[in-house]
């Protein structure tokens, strides 16, 4: 045996020498012929398992004594060396017939089938699969067994947004389990240590910081939890390929690093050294005592100097895992670079282990199953697009005499200040598309947001956001037109393809309320790193000769890689010249674009044309770019043509935005859902007859078809009221605490180029096809109160969707919207808090009244007389005012 080993294998030799304390005088099954196979760096996995001594059930290693660190198990004596040589000589005397390839199963040596050259490849594959299943079973046993704990303590872990969270970490052989609480009930995630590296990380904060990472930036997370959990507890998002961890002190941190390094080796050493030939040891040490003993060893190793006290990894391993069942990580993941040099040299790589890495994500499949084709919505390129001319020409319209009579009839039904949302408007002023479609005009230049997401300077990032915001206004219909009021439950879907980044920007909108009319929308491009959501309440006010369409609400733009939210509002549309003059449509109002995280903001003012203004005064806009209260730059120009920016420090002015013909030519092309795949409540199919009549200039037919849709909506509302039912939205849900509408299937994780493959949409649900399924957690946005938390389910796709088949063969999981806010504060608790506040206010009010009465009773008589005098004077003044009014009436 010793002759077969290379000179560069001292660790392997010491490991066999140390095994005497634990294993006793067991016989090693090897011979002189087999020793020929032990090359300096290569040896098959099965040969390595035969080379290891087999422990017996009746021999145990004595427990360590804290008072004698150099006791048995940490120092090899001369007797141990001599006995080890005797064992080696016995193993060398074995006949050649006793040495066979190990078949990977746990059957008894007397009944196990030995692989021979004549055995077929089918039998070898069967043994290979059984070995994989056995390794999986051992790993699950290690994770679920409460007695196997290498180390457990509270640690602070830094999330994706660079904020720290205190979590309970339990270290087991090959895995690191992370929980929210010490009771191990709220599982957050499981880190697979077999492919991880550990490095100390400098930090300005107190404590000891180190990093656990994958050298190739692959995912370090397991698919499921120790009890089969598919989704972890709600916490801040954690990185996919690394973890930055901070311990309270340097000694604790180095203790954790030593424990993690040992756990990395345990993932492969356990499988090789703890194989039983039909027998398993009974547990002899409880979990508590095992944990304390091991923790003490690691702490002693950090407190003592290296010259006086050094621990051998294999000795610590045997001390902690002595007399326990077989625990190992998956056999398909043993090619970890963190393993010992001795392990790599002795065990080597076989032909089978070279192919195991491709199957490490799911060992439950015996044969790789074919990947199902991606099921996504079919989109077609938009054939026609109307772009209005710049200036006042495209915003004015001369009304015919026939239409004027309709306007006068309409004006008789309204009065100044009245809300026109419930008034049925004539069809000649309708633009042949829905308001949900109209809201998508802002994303033909979504590539500006792709550039902004990559911009490192926050000021330049704000400038790109403002530039994108202005790019959504120059597209306007010719004349004075108003889009359709969406029907309750109406939806609209479209997308834009980015040729530069090969990504897609998806737009989803739904009419979530009819009275009041609220439209919710969601835009997502995870690959380019941004998403946008919001809701708009449309109101109309009549002022006699003019009316205004007010868009209440806000949109929230989020850069996923930075955790920044840009909150922006909308201008209002103002139409004048209804009774006299030319009917003209303009934009007015003040728009705010604010990023609370960076402190940068923009203020844009859309100006209406003055009464005596010229044509140059139409569509004017001015604005400021600010950092806090400091103005960095100003904007001036026209929102449908040139806009200039002037830097306040240098006073230099340049063109900020100008929709030239070249810009319009390179705008992104919109793709809409194929008409045959649209649902009955999608905008294009729902309003198709009205649109056809308007395009044919048949106002009578358009009015009739519009009435049919509106009457069907009213009848449906009456039916729901009769049945005492409430309307349930398909794609959006209302947050009762913030009053905001949110997309049910929103995925705000940063794009992982190593795991995320493609983003797609099916039936209104935006999803991401991933290579490997990983647990996905979500954190509430900063704008929300800390009560809104959303749980997501990660199956084959990163966004949960009912009735969607996993592309890798796993079953889809149905998600109910009601389960997304289990962590939110109950409304009953809020009501009880309000009642408590009311009671406190009543008590304060009673105390104030009592104090006031006391002051009045102690007031001197002169003050009382003056008060009566004042009342008398006030009475005379009021009487005089009444007399004067009566005389001049």
Curated annotation (Swiss-Prot):
SMART domains, per database record: PH
SUPFAM superfamilies referenced in this protein's UniProt entry, alphabetically: Oxysterol-binding protein-like, PH domain-like
Compositional bias segments (type: Polar residues): 28-46, 62-71, 805-817
GO CC entries: cortical endoplasmic reticulum; cytosol; endoplasmic reticulum; endoplasmic reticulum membrane; membrane; nuclear membrane
Basic and acidic residues compositional bias, start-end: 73-88, 95-109, 116-129, 322-336, 346-363
Modified residues (N-acetylmethionine): 1
InterPro entries on file: OSBP_sf, Oxysterol-bd, Oxysterol-bd_CS, PH-like_dom_sf, PH_domain
PROSITE patterns: OSBP, PH_DOMAIN
Pfam families linked to this entry: Oxysterol_BP, PH
Biological processes annotated in GO: fat cell differentiation; negative regulation of cell migration; phosphatidylserine acyl-chain remodeling; phospholipid transport; positive regulation of D-glucose import; positive regulation of insulin receptor signaling pathway; positive regulation of phosphatidylinositol 3-kinase/protein kinase B signal transduction; protein localization to nuclear pore
Keyword Secreted on entry: no
Record PTM Phosphoserine, positions in chain: 14, 65, 68, 314, 328, 342, 807-808, 810, 814
Sequence ranges assigned to domain PH in this UniProt record: 148-265
Positions of transmembrane segments: 871-888
GO molecular function terms listed in the Swiss-Prot or TrEMBL record: cholesterol binding; phosphatidylinositol-4-phosphate binding; phosphatidylserine binding; phosphatidylserine transfer activity; phospholipid transporter activity
Tissues and organs where the protein is expressed, per its UniProt entry: Widely expressed. Expressed at higher level in macrophages.
Gene3D superfamilies: 1.10.287.2720, 2.40.160.120, 3.30.70.3490, Pleckstrin-homology domain (PH domain)/Phosphotyrosine-binding domain (PTB)
Compositional bias ranges of the Basic residues kind: 781-794
Start and end residues of each stretch annotated as Disordered: 1-129, 322-399, 771-823
The entry's keywords: Acetylation, Endoplasmic reticulum, Lipid transport, Lipid-binding, Membrane, Nucleus, Phosphoprotein, Transmembrane, Transmembrane helix, Transport
Family, similarity comment: Belongs to the OSBP family.
The protein's role, per its UniProt record: Lipid transporter involved in lipid countertransport between the endoplasmic reticulum and the plasma membrane: specifically exchanges phosphatidylserine with phosphatidylinositol 4-phosphate (PI4P), delivering phosphatidylserine to the plasma membrane in exchange for PI4P, which is degraded by the SAC1/SACM1L phosphatase in the endoplasmic reticulum. Binds phosphatidylserine and PI4P in a mutually exclusive manner. Binds oxysterol, 25-hydroxycholesterol and cholesterol.
Quaternary context: Interacts with SPAG5. Interacts with NUP62.
Record's protein name: Oxysterol-binding protein-related protein 8
Gene name linked to the record: OSBPL8
